[in-house]
Amino acid sequence: MTRPAAFGISFDSDRDQTSAAAAPYNSRDHLAVQDQRSRLPVHKHRKELLYLVEGHATTLVVGETGSGKTTQIPQYLHEAGWTGGGRMVACTQPRRVAAMTVAARVAEEVGTELGQQVGYSIRFEEVCTQGVTCIKYCTDGVLLREMMEDPLLSAYSVVMVDEAHERSLATDVLLGLLKKVQRQRPDLRVVISSATLQADKLAAFFDTTTVKGQGAGATGISKSPAIMSVEGRTHPVQQHYAESPVLDYVQAAVTTAVSIHEQDLPGDILIFLTGQEECEAAVTMLDEEARRFRRAQGNSLRLMPVALYAGLPAASQLQVFEMTPRGYRKVVAATNIAETSVTLEGVVYVVDSCFAKQQAYNPLTGLESLLVAPISKASAAQRAGRAGRVRPGFCFRLCTEQDFQALPDSSVPEMQRCELASTVLQLKAMGIDNIMKFEWLAPPPAETMVRALELLHALGALGDDARCQSCLWIPALLKLFLPLLGSWPVARRWSLLWPCSACTACGQEPMGSAKPTMKPNSGLLLEKAT
């Protein structure tokens, strides 16, 4: 078992003898909301940002963690008049909890009720008022579904794609579609922001100045993307590594958190694990430690373990962001949902397992898997940055420094490691018939694309010419079914049977060929083809 001595460090220099039980000091807590806004690093770049957005079709913002880009840029655009004429500013997030929490914060800063001038839209829930909402936070998947009804996004004047470095499937598809939309709508502005953005690659993707007839038009709008860097507000974070490889990273993470708690220093703890089962197991172990500490009564701070993962109900997710009661130390066991966008105030210590679950797809067998894999250095940097928001922090990585240096610099985009049948069908329904010529930020493997077309043809969704069958039905049916596909506990190919069978007037049970079986204690359904 890994004990604190495995890191070979001491917290004595960080100890505050006068207020051990106090919450971590945030120098901006006492300020009014508008004063807090003015002290964010992005505020000094406000005029520069608005100038770039005015003169360039695409603007790339490289903003470090804590710069305020997610909350402030949409407000700057609103204040500059980009929401005039009934249009909105959209800001996409890769996860629903980020869209909800950021929208709530921005509504507070604007001084309006959530759902009025500022709203959000996620799967199965929309808190907006038509004709009133000016700033809309949504997941990238929601905006993709809106494009099926309004391909040119006529309701928006600016679309901001946040956390683009995560390179999710929906984000990559959205970026490709936005590039197409800009050809038809020169007035549409696209702002792409991230903390670890590969700006040069994205700039080259959106640069159309080399395309014949795509230079600066009569309006004077430059087709060459502008790049702006914004410094962060993070405090220094000490990074520590295990002296030897860790056998059980869940147990090691709990042990490390307990050792931090025993030092009786202020500050919450954030543990990064890979999934729901691990988070719940860690919370159970921490609950046992909390009872032990209460019996011993040797610590002035009480442990308050909580979990944070995508499967939690929205209300439970939001509870994690509530202020930690005085006299308690919150320990959050989270998946990579806490890696970007969301801010857990009060976190001083990060315990990083250096693992995450990633989707993998083998086009030869047609099987998808959810694997536990090492994270990239870029993700590790994001996780460490969670510890430096309110004061100097500590990051404990449960791997040796040698193993950390062997990690890849960045993760493989989801586009290149997942099945694409539903994505291809969605693009076909939007009228993009020649998928092979669609401009991808990261082109998917040819074998994966061929497999997707074969599957859709076998299901009857595509004809021999690779065009949509019953083209009048598919867009409407996809709009109805796509919000449900991700929630059905079956493999993606079987969920596609429902809209496809409806389009082809199939009279048999569409799910008859898939007999789901329950895996004990997992809550997941595994496909079993007959």
Residue positions per predicted region:
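P-loop NTPase motor module signature
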Residues: 1-480, 486-488, 500-511, 515-528
